[in-house]
Structures are given as C-alpha cells and as structure tokens.
Design a protein with these regions (language model features):
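Mid-chain, well-packed structural core segment of small domains
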Residues: 65-91
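Short, surface-exposed, polar/charged, turn-prone segments marking secondary-structure boundaries
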Residues: 31, 37-42, 61-62, 77, ...
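Short, charged/polar low-complexity linear motifs in solvent-exposed/disordered segments
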Residues: 28-29, 40, 69, 74-75, ...
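Hot-dog-fold acyl-thioester-processing enzymes
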Residues: 1-70
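HotDog/MaoC-like acyl-thioester-processing domains
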Residues: 1-8, 83-130
Length: 130
C-alpha cells in the first residue's frame, strides 16, 4: 500500500477489566493504580485507570492493520487524560508527511475517549513495506 498524506485508519475498543489484568500480566506492570481500586481511590485519580500503554497499543494495531502494515521506526506520545475501564476508545493514525528522499512516512496519532476527548496524542514514523 502506497501511503499518501490524508490516508488514515481507526480502530475502536471498549476496555475491560480483563484487558487491564491481561496487559498487567503480559507486561509485568502491576502498578496498583491500575489494579487495586482501594489504593487507586486514594490517589488524585479517584479510582483505577487503564495503563497508558494499553491505550497506546491500539495505535500499533491501527498502523499494522488499517495502513498496510508498515514497520514502526519511532513514536512520541503524550498522555493527556486517563482512560477508565469500560470506556470505548478510538485510535486514529493519519499520514501527515511522506519523505521524498527515503521511504519514511510520518503519522499523526490520536486516541480519543467515547466523548471525543483526546486521551493520547503523538506522532509516529513508519517504513512502508512496499
């Protein structure tokens, strides 16, 4: 797939407690802010929040499935708002630049919550596979 500015893809997912538990198991990130409601209630967040990287991992899924499967070269991320279990989030990646001298593409990456607020923003650089 030849990528050009304006090409984009999206993926939505409702985050479950099982997703959070499995992500914690796979990554060994057992921070109680994500897993222990009693602990998390005492924090500035007032309850458990989803691992930021769990939300960001949907960006990888979009790039790998909706944009022809280019190879990740880099990614910047800003975690703007917390994600809560039960929220439906949508990851979107949009081509904003294609280098003329090399096959390198820059993507704007955004994860939004179900009311359209940005929760994660950033940019990715990718190498198209063809």
């Amino acid at each position: 797939m030849k990528l050009k500015p304006g090409d984009h893809g999206s993926l939505s997912k409702t985050i479950t407690q099982e997703d959070v538990a499995e992500f914690a198991r796979i990554t060994s990130d057992t921070n109680p802010l994500h897993l222990d409601e009693a602990y998390a209630r005492q924090t500035r967040f007032g309850g458990c929040i989803v691992h930021g990287m769990l939300g960001a991992s949907l960006i990888s899924a979009v790039i790998g499935t909706a944009l022809g499967g280019p190879i990740y070269l880099g990614q910047t991320l800003k975690f703007v708002k917390p994600i809560r279990v039960g929220e439906t989030i949508t990851a979107t990646a949009e081509v904003i630049a294609v280098r003329e001298d090399k096959p390198i593409v820059t993507l704007r990456t955004v994860v939004t919550n179900e009311i359209g607020e940005d929760v994660i923003v950033g940019e990715a650089t990718v190498l198209p596979v063809s």
